[in-house]
Amino acid sequence: MKIKRLQPECNLATVRDGRGGIFTFYPEKPVVEFNFQFINKNTIRGNHYHPEFDEYYLFTEGNGVVVTRNDEGKEEFLYVGTGDCLYIPQGVSHVTYAITDIKYVTFLTKKWNDCEKPIVHEDLGMGAAPK
């Protein structure tokens, strides 16, 4: 399993009327918790995986690179920016490097506080994971 970029649907009438746009993402699993997060420019957040839940990222501001490993252990990179939505399956390692300041919302499929072990830290080569 690997990280994938979700493609939104858009009701074009919301764009054509001049007021903006509404872009809709459909999660594969129900979301039970969401968190607003930010990463300062030239720093990382991550170097871990979640053994008990899937996670979705919706980037609301900024640009960065999300690093993961494929099933063969090789690093893969996803460039992300404002409006991108990623699905990160349970057990998939990930780390985000902020090219600019990043703001994003994370959506979890299980409440963090209901997990016996919500996070497992490791090193994906982007810097040391917090203890």
Residue ranges of model-derived segments:
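Short strand-connecting beta-turns/loops that link adjacent beta-strands
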Residues: 30, 52, 71-72, 101
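Residue-level signal for short segments within beta-strands and strand-turn junctions
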Residues: 60, 68-70, 108
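Double-stranded beta-helix
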Residues: 2-10, 14-17, 37, 95-131
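Short beta-strand His + acidic residue motifs that chelate non-heme Fe in jelly-roll/DSBH
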Residues: 47, 66-67, 88, 93-99, ...
